[in-house]
Amino acid sequence: MSLSSPTSACSSSRCYSSGLSFPIGFGSNPINVGLVCYPKRYSIAARKFVVACSSSSSDPLLVKAAKGQAISRPPAWMMRQAGRYMAVYQKLAKKHPSFRERSENTDLIVEISLQPWQAFRPDGVIIFSDILTPLPAFGVPFDIEEVKGPVIQSPIRTEEDMKRLHPIDFEKLQFVGDSLKILRREVGEHAAVLGFVGAPWTIATYIVEGGTTRTYTVIKNMCHTAPDVLRALLSHLTKAITEYVVYQVEHGAHCIQIFDSWGGQLTPEMWERWSKPYIEEIIHAVKKRCPDTPIVFYINGNGGLLERMKGTGADVIGLDWTVDMADGRRRLGSEVSVQGNVDPAYLFSPLPALTEEIERVVKCAGPKGHILNLGHGVLVGTPEEAVAHFFETARNLDYQTLFQNHVPAEKAEPELVV
């Protein structure tokens, strides 16, 4: 079976540079039928979307939404859509109990990634992986213990520790590239293949703390006691993650999501200093090399950071479920697309309540530039019936029907006609 590379969205021919340098030696109310909470600027676009939908572009629906193009319905996928809530995954995990094996073996990665695609037909198929997967490729070995989770035996906290790091070695990540190629071929243009990375700050929390933590006291203290070392680490991570993003795109990813999972643990001012500049650098570099690849940016607990997140240059801002979608749209404006943000707990609710919440979120997001998703990952124990209903509801949505009663006459705003 050939693993020939799909058409690259990147302007560079190859992205395997080994010459990386670094500073040192690396609960909702039922819908009111009359409710309209999308911003007024979308009203004409809602009525005019039919014209743009005749475009000959071969981009999957999710990519079009990420780019803010007019489409007929919101595309849908779920964070953690492949995983422990699915019976087929549980059966496979019994045969292959090591998470590292499941996420670092091409055959298993492809099989697990395709499980929700085969069951529910989402509009996005995300590679089954982990934000820590690339760490050994640049000098940070780690283990995953059943109770403690990821464990890094030798944290990086000093200038001497930094010498253990090296440029990212893609020979150690071939399983990622091969898996993306196969996924791209398997789903064709029927769905977008999504790759993902962790943001430098979030990855650094594991490397500095030595694993997961509830307090982040060690790395937060480093901001004041060893800022040069922390900056050097973040700079090294930024270069490695940039190359890893481009590697994923060149091997088939239509779209990339950046997870700053623990960025919300910082004050807005500290996030502006210790996370945002490095994310901006990644996005700027990727946009130069892969200008047609949309980048989604998500922070858990991002209600106080939306405007700052927009400033990174990401194409799509993911909202967690604690953010009101209408308020998020108002604060972000029409220049970026949004993703989200159904509360994952709604998947445990009666199906009619789930339907109402999906419709409410879609109405608040407006008829353009919205990727329907949860506000966080799928929870363990989520009924598969509810996941199936989520995607079926999304497929049956139609912007023209949802917004037809709320579009003012063209004469009211002729300057907005496109």
UniProtKB/Swiss-Prot annotation:
Q: In which pathway does it act?
A: Porphyrin-containing compound metabolism; protoporphyrin-IX biosynthesis; coproporphyrinogen-III from 5-aminolevulinate: step 4/4; Porphyrin-containing compound metabolism; chlorophyll biosynthesis
Which BP terms does GO give this entry?
A: chlorophyll biosynthetic process; protoporphyrinogen IX biosynthetic process; response to cadmium ion
User: What InterPro entries does the record point to?
Assistant: UROD/MetE-like_sf, Uroporphyrinogen_deCO2ase_HemE, Uroporphyrinogen_deCOase
Q: Which reactions does this protein catalyse?
A: uroporphyrinogen III + 4 H(+) = coproporphyrinogen III + 4 CO2
Q: Which Pfam families match?
A: URO-D
Q: Where in the cell is it found?
A: Plastid, Chloroplast
Renumbered to this chain, the signal peptide range is none
Q: Where is this site: Transition state stabilizer?
A: D130
User: What are the alphabetically sorted keywords of the record?
Assistant: Chlorophyll biosynthesis, Chloroplast, Decarboxylase, Lyase, Plastid, Porphyrin biosynthesis, Transit peptide
Stated role: Catalyzes the decarboxylation of four acetate groups of uroporphyrinogen-III to yield coproporphyrinogen-III.
Protein name, entry field:
Uroporphyrinogen decarboxylase 1, chloroplastic
Q: Which gene encodes it?
A: HEME1
